[in-house]
Amino acid sequence: MVNVVLGAQWGDEGKGKLVDLLVGKYDLVARCAGGNNAGHTIVVDGVKYDFHMLPSGLVNPKSLNLLGNGVVIHVPSFFKELEDLETKGLNDARERLFISSRAHLVFDFHQRTDKLRELELSGASTDGKNIGTTGKGIGPTYATKASRSGIRVHHLVNDNPESWTVFENMYRRLLETRKKRYGDFEYDAEGELARFKKYKEDLKPFVVDSVVFMHKAIEAKKKILVEGANALMLDIDFGTYPFVTSSNTGIAGVISGLGIPPKVIDECYGVVKAYTTRVGEGPFPTEQLNEDGEKLQEIGAEYGVTTGRKRRCGWLDLVIMKYSTLINGYTSLNITKLDVLDTFKEIPIGIGYYYKGQKLDLFPEDLIKLGKVEVEYKVLPGWQQDITKVTKYDDLPENAKKYIKFIEDFVGVPVEWVGTGPSRDNMVHKEIQRI
């Protein structure tokens, strides 16, 4: 059994909370894409764990955890995050954590050039704005991967006598291309090489052939949960390009990032915030640059876990949700942070885009067009009462249930979970009919 949790908007939907709720049922939790540019927090028994690169399954003592071939690994951050978790009591994390030998390595010079690329890419955008990178070196690493000059984990940990020489030569060639690309590029290559000589032995116990690892688990009928990073609207192919991340963050990234066939995936859970947020630049049709937007930001505490940047806020956009569902094929939805809407008298929902008076059939790929659309809204009545103490779906206010029903009917996917507050216990389960 393979189930997948994916973000349905622009990230920060609260995927970690659903994973936290589900993880106790799974034998293996895997990440398939991204690096330490993601970020979410899980609270267990009053202890707060911050995850960026590592799978959330580490909080479950019975789960194995895998960073798949589609993940990019910044080794210093890997060990720092692992050590932070260990200091908070996850003492057996090292025994339950594995890394794909095919995963690519993020070097410090990737992070150094990330900001330089940000300045260049701003010139390629439609309005001269920055892309909004986290500066973690993720994009440059995927770029070297695509250009076939990247360095994989197995290049570092290989036991062949000449393996270090091969790794060092690859590293110097890769660094030289950075210097040629960016001119006067001062960098302590010898210092980083010395650190990686130590990492060679430190990393080795974690490394596995992830294709063999995954398929053995599937053949053994293990319960597997795939934890998606970012979200569909940040996908390199299907997101608001170029204001996206550098990997496939939808269902395609699960398949390519773990080396598994589509037929083994049983359920795909889409996580969607009850309103919409976005970090960084790029078009945002339902954004509210007014008191409503400020209220959503304040009540929702909308600041990024990884960057600390304030998130832009707006109403729920069901045009995006339909598009996201079309690509990812969600079998059920988790609506998060519904409680943030508790005090609103009326709640608009974006249900259509108009461009030059014509209604668009689908979310457009043209950002110039997207930046000029007029949004059609359906205004629903609010419930204006506190839902944070609700523990059963039937006990939600009628208008809250009507809000959820409207989403289900419009998108064509049942809602299975509803987030009703910030605590890990603030999640209401709704029975659905599975086909």
Swiss-Prot record:
It is found in: Cytoplasm. The active site is at D12 (proton acceptor), H40 (proton donor). IMP binds at D12, E13, G14, K15, N37, A38, G39, H40, T134, R148, N230, T245, R309. It comes from the Eukaryota. Substrate binds at V305, T306, T307, G308, R309, K310, R311. Its cofactor is Mg(2+). Keywords: Cytoplasm, GTP-binding, Ligase, Magnesium, Metal-binding, Nucleotide-binding, Purine biosynthesis. Homodimer. Belongs to the adenylosuccinate synthetase family. This is Adenylosuccinate synthetase. It comes from Zygosaccharomyces rouxii (strain ATCC 2623 / CBS 732 / NBRC 1130 / NCYC 568 / NRRL Y-229).
